[in-house]
Swiss-Prot record:
This is Sulfur carrier protein TtuB. There is a cross-link at residue 65 (Glycyl cysteine thioester (Gly-Cys) (interchain with C-192 in TtuC)). It holds the Pfam family ThiS. Belongs to the TtuB family. The keyword Zinc does not apply. Disruption phenotype: Disruption of this gene completely abolishes the presence of m(5)s(2)U in tRNAs, although its precursor, 5-methyluridine (ribothymidine) is present; other nucleoside modifications remain unchanged. These deletion mutants exhibit a temperature-sensitive phenotype, they are unable to grow above 80 degrees Celsius. The lineage of its organism: Bacteria, Thermotogati, Deinococcota, Deinococci, Thermales. There is a cross-link at residue 65 (Glycyl lysine isopeptide (Gly-Lys) (interchain with K-? in acceptor proteins)). Required for the 2-thiolation of 5-methyluridine residue at position 54 in the T loop of tRNAs, leading to 5-methyl-2-thiouridine (m(5)s(2)U or s(2)T). This modification allows thermal stabilization of tRNAs in thermophilic microorganisms, and is essential for cell growth at high temperatures. Thiocarboxylated TtuB functions as the sulfur donor in the sulfurtransferase reaction catalyzed by TtuA. TtuB also functions as a protein modifier covalently attached to lysine residues of the target proteins TtuA and TtuC. The modification 1-thioglycine is found at residue 65.
Amino acid sequence: MRVVLRLPERKEVEVKGNRPLREVLEELGLNPETVVAVRGEELLTLEDEVREEDTLEVLSAISGG
């Protein structure tokens, strides 16, 4: 799957295999408590199954100010 990270810089990575979002975030070294993931217009939960053909966008859930 293609994963677009915006944390805050933009970076694209490829991840292989179908699995729960939680496992994808762990593989990428991301803390699931500090990011949100979107597939199209759908906000994903950590238990949602993501598939190899998906494109995900991962955004920081914490902002400074």
